[in-house]
Amino acid sequence: MADREGGCAAGRGRELEPELEPGPGPGSALEPGEEFEIVDRSQLPGPGDLRSATRPRAAEGWSAPILTLARRATGNLSASCGSALRAAAGLGGGDSGDGTARAASKCQMMEERANLMHMMKLSIKVLLQSALSLGRSLDADHAPLQQFFVVMEHCLKHGLKVKKSFIGQNKSFFGPLELVEKLCPEASDIATSVRNLPELKTAVGRGRAWLYLALMQKKLADYLKVLIDNKHLLSEFYEPEALMMEEEGMVIVGLLVGLNVLDANLCLKGEDLDSQVGVIDFSLYLKDVQDLDGGKEHERITDVLDQKNYVEELNRHLSCTVGDLQTKIDGLEKTNSKLQEELSAATDRICSLQEEQQQLREQNELIRERSEKSVEITKQDTKVELETYKQTRQGLDEMYSDVWKQLKEEKKVRLELEKELELQIGMKTEMEIAMKLLEKDTHEKQDTLVALRQQLEEVKAINLQMFHKAQNAESSLQQKNEAITSFEGKTNQVMSSMKQMEERLQHSERARQGAEERSHKLQQELGGRIGALQLQLSQLHEQCSSLEKELKSEKEQRQALQRELQHEKDTSSLLRMELQQVEGLKKELRELQDEKAELQKICEEQEQALQEMGLHLSQSKLKMEDIKEVNQALKGHAWLKDDEATHCRQCEKEFSISRRKHHCRNCGHIFCNTCSSNELALPSYPKPVRVCDSCHTLLLQRCSSTAS
């Protein structure tokens, strides 16, 4: 339809008159019993009747040829608009003229809405019939699909506000479609892809591309429903009487749900989407009058049957509504009786409450008199209390000063405690550091243990040497003691011999006097013997002194050896103490090693569990990816028909009798035998099936990643 500019009735008649293109397209004839109806202003239903009328109207057919009805509608429109203009001219100027103009524009908008809604019904029906005959897959060259987009564009442009800018006036339906991106996040992909198309230069082209993509996604009805549900946002773009703002918008959304059955493959590249708005081709929906003359009786019968079914359905609906209303009336009568009972109870309660109110007033007066008396008494009491308060305040001030001092002392104590706490925290950190150092010390003590063992072995060897030396010294001491005892015996013998000699000398001296002569002779012999004996005595004295010196030196050596033995005993006791400490450290080390082994076992078990969990997770992720790809393959990849493909997708060679067509069971596209000679097992097929080269390499990479 051409855009309306508002004016005389003749102009409106020209706009509503359909432009017929020569040459009938596919599906140019309607079935018998179908018609397209252009409604007059007087026949328009109210907004409340639209909801109930849409259900039976879906089953209704069209009962007259569209051309005659279109001419009749244009005549009615011209007559009604002419009468409206004459009435406006007769009333003359001011507010009355504006009111009639507004009423005329509202009527015009209502007629346009009804015509567009019926046109949308026709275009969707013809599109579905042609799609069913062709196999439910459509492309951009399909004539009913093109006409559907033209009608859809007219519906979206109906009642659209004109936006003024510095460049000029702009009237495009892409503005409200952009709101879908904010209301429905799923539509963001469509909006971004439309904006990124470099071929589109105008907002009209972007809006058409958006409609193409939404139809291919099978979500056109959902997106438009979201828009219509948010009419407060649409009011910025549309007039209040626009199609998208009224009930007809919801009807069109319900009709668009049926298009989700179709598969549309529309290529946006190479399409001139920025061109002017197309004209609706009524040749797709028209039949010749000659063809319709033969089926008039059949049409009348079908009309009568349809009207009969419609009346029966209305009767059923009305009987149901009557029953519902009867039940509602019964419920309302019951509630009314209950409310009357409650009202009587409420009136009785009000009377009792009024009596209680009078009693309370009398009690209030008595309480007031008593309160006045009590106020005088309390005044006297307050004076006494003031004096006591002043006295107590002085005491409280003193108490406050004492408490303030205590508070200061407690603050000091608190600061000291905080310092101690900080010290304890420091000690705790030092303990943690000491624990770490202990671990280091254990390693160092292990090294010192090895060194101490070596030192123990050396000390044992030294002790053995010293023990042997002590034994040798004791044996030599025993020998020397024996020699001393022998020398003492010899000296005793010499002393006894000396005594004997002295006795002999005395005898000799006595005998000398008696026998001087004999002694004089023997004196020389005895003198020589005495000198020899004296020499022997001196030698024996020298030997005794040397033996005594040797004894002293041996005693000193013995004492030194005893000291060394005592020192060695002390060192051995210290070493034993250290050995005991080392044994305690060994026990601690063993306990720590056992704890370490247990912790290592727990760590290894946890690592094994983590590895197993990682393997399970990786396997589950791979399974999820396989399932997602299978779902994508089931959802996204369209199974191409043999008629749609003329060339191989990979090598782009034309199919012939020798070069046959083969489907890839993974992506659904058609390839030649050389490009799809591989076979692989897929999750959706139990046996190995034919796969193209690209899918074969991709599946092999995935299998290798899962195996690794």
UniProtKB/Swiss-Prot annotation:
Per the record, residues carrying Phosphoserine are S620
Zinc fingers (FYVE-type): which spans? 642-700
Q: Which residues form a coiled coil?
A: 321-374, 405-617
Q: Which residues carry this modification: Phosphotyrosine?
A: Y389, Y400
Ranges for domain RUN:
139-271
Report which superkingdom the organism of origin falls in: Eukaryota
Record has Protein transport as a keyword: yes
| Region Interaction with RAB4, annotated ranges | 615-625
**InterPro entries xrefs:** FYVE_RUFY1, RUFY1-3, Run_dom, Run_dom_sf, RUN_RUFY1, Znf_FYVE, Znf_FYVE-rel, Znf_FYVE_PHD
Effect ascribed to mutating C267F: In a breast cancer sample; somatic mutation
PTMs?
Answer: Phosphorylation on Tyr-389 and/or Tyr-400 is required for interaction with BMX and endosomal targeting.
Q: Where is the composition biased (Basic and acidic residues)?
A: 1-17, 500-522
Q: Please provide the record's keywords in A-Z order.
A: Coiled coil, Endocytosis, Endosome, Lipid-binding, Membrane, Metal-binding, Phosphoprotein, Protein transport, Transport, Zinc, Zinc-finger
Q: Which GO terms describe its biological process?
A: early endosome to Golgi transport; endocytosis; endosomal vesicle fusion; protein transport; regulation of endocytosis; small GTPase-mediated signal transduction
Name the membrane topology term: Peripheral membrane protein
Q: Does the keyword Zinc-finger apply?
A: yes
Q: What cellular-component terms does GO give this entry?
A: cytoplasm; cytosol; early endosome membrane; endosome; intracellular membrane-bounded organelle; nuclear speck
| List of residues binding Zn(2+) 2 | C664, C667, C692, C695
Q: What compartments host this protein? A: Early endosome membrane
Residues of the region (Disordered) are 1-57, 493-522
Where Zn(2+) 1 is bound, by residue?
C648, C651, C672, C675
Assembly and oligomerization: Self-assembles through coiled coil domains to drive ELVA (endo-lysosomal vesicular assembly) formation. Interacts with BMX. May interact with SSB. Interacts with RAB4 and RAB5 that have been activated by GTP-binding. Interacts WITH RAB14 and RAB4B (GTP-bound form); the interactions allow endosomal tethering and fusion. Interacts with ARL8B (GTP-bound form); the interaction is required for RUFY1 endosomal location and promotes interaction with RAB14.
What is the stated purpose of this protein? Activating adapter involved in cargo sorting from early/recycling endosomes. Regulates retrieval of proteins from endosomes to the trans-Golgi network through interaction with the dynein-dynactin complex. Dual effector of RAB4B and RAB14, mediates a cooperative interaction allowing endosomal tethering and fusion. Binds phospholipid vesicles containing phosphatidylinositol 3-phosphate and participates in early endosomal trafficking.
User: What domain comment accompanies this record?
Assistant: The FYVE-type zinc finger domain mediates interactions with phosphatidylinositol 3-phosphate in membranes of early endosomes and penetrates bilayers. The FYVE domain insertion into PtdIns(3)P-enriched membranes is substantially increased in acidic conditions. The 2 coiled coil domains mediate the interaction with the dynein-dynactin complex, the RUN domain is also involved in the interaction. The coiled coil domains also mediate self-association.
Q: What is this protein called?
A: RUN and FYVE domain-containing protein 1
What is the species of this protein?
Answer: Homo sapiens (Human)
